Amino acid sequence: MNPQIQVNGQPESLATFTLEALLRTKGVAPGAKGVAVALNGQVVPAGRWPETRLSPGDELEIVRPFSGG
């Protein structure tokens, strides 16, 4: 069984071990403007995404702006 994390409340296999790599799989470019990320309830500044390691059981929240009315 693959290790799991929670991403925006949904279980997901932990296929990569850095925050930046996971965000890339979600279409978030490194250092993307307007994107907020919290890992286990703590905001992670974009400059720390490459060095932030993910572990089984982590809870990740990704907030992105969207257009609409």
Identify the function of each model-found stretch.
Residues M1-G68:
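Ubiquitin-like/PB1-type beta-grasp interaction modules and other compact soluble beta-rich domains
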